[in-house]
């Protein structure tokens, strides 16, 4: 019998590129190289993203020769579901295993306006935010575009059973999306394309901890994707404590990049602000935040943080959250408190993966 380690080594040795990593024009280019008509790309995408088949033999309108070429050249990436947790509010958290044995998290959230999915872009994270479970263990590797796409496909397969669909997505799972920029953009274009999963650009949101050079680059992209900054503090001292990335990309430089993005795109930006008891949740912190954002076309999303056992932070009391919100509103800031979901499962980003890793080391 093969051990898990041997299977993983075998997978690494035999791995082919993921077909989910190809954008439509890249599929057309590959078909041309194979002497095949480029219209076949649309048929292949239909099988992958509309019918969601798991093997090439099911692509019945393709000649066997083409199916064999596809099979010899590309893997249809499938993710092994290790854990599936369902919350009382309908939130579902998936722990998926990748071909090399690493695991990642994906979350399905149910809203009145539809189903939203939160995807992961890296195995682990290098950013080191002191409140986050995702960074425990550091960064292992970037996900390929196809591995990010496969998360959406797998969740959509789960929704097929109840004839539902993924209608929006947020790139706010494990990892820093802008540290995996090229694969991130390929993923977004694949899921946005009408022949792909076809999620509208305005129904997608990318969040960053503040990689300043990539904010300027993202401002030049030709997609109207929503953009969010994980801010969590409006002064340098507190933000550097919560988010060490602030030492590399200072708050004034971050705000300059934000203003460039807003002016270049005309789009409103969202600032995510997690409230940590006794750290950044007092009235004076709200006043600092309002001053920092004055004149910026933005929205603030206040986040009552989920408890992470490996971290020391505590939740801000409910009445303090409302006072913080009121302080911002009184100063003209557009603000909402994020609705809590998945509170009765391992809801914090990276928490389920950290729990699984801990079990494996026992």
From Swiss-Prot:
UniProt subcellular location: Cytoplasm
Family classification: Belongs to the radical SAM superfamily. RlmN family.
Cofactor: [4Fe-4S] cluster
Presence of keyword Cytoplasm: yes
Keyword tRNA processing among UniProt keywords: yes
Entry EC number(s): 2.1.1.192
Enzyme class: transferase
Residues at which [4Fe-4S] cluster binds: 125, 129, 132
Database matches in PROSITE patterns: RADICAL_SAM (PS51918)
Reactions this protein catalyses: adenosine(2503) in 23S rRNA + 2 reduced [2Fe-2S]-[ferredoxin] + 2 S-adenosyl-L-methionine = 2-methyladenosine(2503) in 23S rRNA + 5'-deoxyadenosine + L-methionine + 2 oxidized [2Fe-2S]-[ferredoxin] + S-adenosyl-L-homocysteine; adenosine(37) in tRNA + 2 reduced [2Fe-2S]-[ferredoxin] + 2 S-adenosyl-L-methionine = 2-methyladenosine(37) in tRNA + 5'-deoxyadenosine + L-methionine + 2 oxidized [2Fe-2S]-[ferredoxin] + S-adenosyl-L-homocysteine
Alphabetical UniProt keywords: 4Fe-4S, Cytoplasm, Disulfide bond, Iron, Iron-sulfur, Metal-binding, Methyltransferase, rRNA processing, S-adenosyl-L-methionine, Transferase, tRNA processing
Location of the active site: 105, 349
Residue stretches in coiled coil: none
GO MF annotation terms: 4 iron, 4 sulfur cluster binding; metal ion binding; rRNA (adenine(2503)-C2-)-methyltransferase activity; rRNA binding; tRNA (adenine(37)-C2)-methyltransferase activity; tRNA binding
Gene Ontology annotations for the cellular component aspect, listed alphabetically: cytoplasm
PANTHER family: 23S RRNA METHYLTRANSFERASE (PTHR30544), RADICAL SAM CORE DOMAIN-CONTAINING PROTEIN (PTHR30544:SF5)
Cofactor binding summary note: Binds 1 [4Fe-4S] cluster. The cluster is coordinated with 3 cysteines and an exchangeable S-adenosyl-L-methionine.
Protein name from the UniProt record: Probable dual-specificity RNA methyltransferase RlmN
């Amino acid at each position: 019998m093969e051990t898990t380690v041997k299977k993983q080594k075998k997978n690494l040795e035999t791995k082919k590129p993921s077909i989910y990593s190809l954008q439509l024009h890249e599929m057309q280019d590959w078909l041309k190289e194979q002497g095949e008509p480029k219209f076949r790309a649309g048929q292949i995408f239909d099988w992958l993203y509309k019918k969601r088949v798991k093997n090439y033999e099911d692509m019945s309108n393709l000649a066997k020769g083409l199916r064999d070429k596809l099979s010899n050249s590309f893997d249809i990436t499938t993710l092994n579901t290790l854990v599936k947790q369902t919350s009382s509010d309908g939130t579902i958290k998936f722990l998926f295993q990748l071909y090399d044995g690493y695991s990642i998290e994906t979350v399905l959230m149910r809203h009145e306006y539809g189903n939203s999915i939160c995807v992961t872009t890296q195995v682990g994270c290098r950013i080191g935010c002191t409140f986050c479970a995702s960074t425990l263990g550091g960064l292992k590797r970037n996900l390929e575009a196809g591995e990010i796409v496969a998360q959406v496909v797998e969740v959509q397969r789960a929704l097929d059973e109840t004839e539902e669909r993924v209608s929006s997505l947020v790139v706010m799972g494990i990892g820093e999306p802008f540290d995996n920029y090229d694969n991130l953009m390929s993923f977004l274009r694949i899921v946005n394309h009408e022949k792909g999963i076809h999620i509208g650009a305005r129904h997608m949101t990318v969040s960053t901890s503040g990689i300043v050079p990539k904010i300027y680059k993202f401002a030049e992209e030709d997609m109207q994707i929503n953009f969010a900054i994980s801010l969590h503090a409006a002064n340098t001292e507190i933000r550097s404590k919560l988010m060490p990335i602030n030492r590399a990309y200072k708050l004034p430089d971050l705000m300059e990049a934000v203003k460039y993005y807003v002016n270049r795109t005309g789009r409103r930006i969202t600032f995510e602000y997690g409230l940590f008891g006794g750290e950044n949740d007092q009235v004076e912190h709200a006043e600092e935040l309002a001053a920092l954002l004055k004149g910026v076309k933005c929205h603030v999303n206040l986040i009552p943080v989920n408890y992470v056992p490996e971290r020391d932070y505590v939740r801000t009391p409910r009445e303090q959250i409302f006072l913080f919100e009121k302080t911002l509103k009184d100063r003209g800031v557009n603000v909402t408190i994020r609705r809590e979901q998945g509170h009765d499962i391992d809801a914090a980003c990276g928490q389920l993966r950290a729990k699984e890793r801990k079990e494996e080391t026992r």
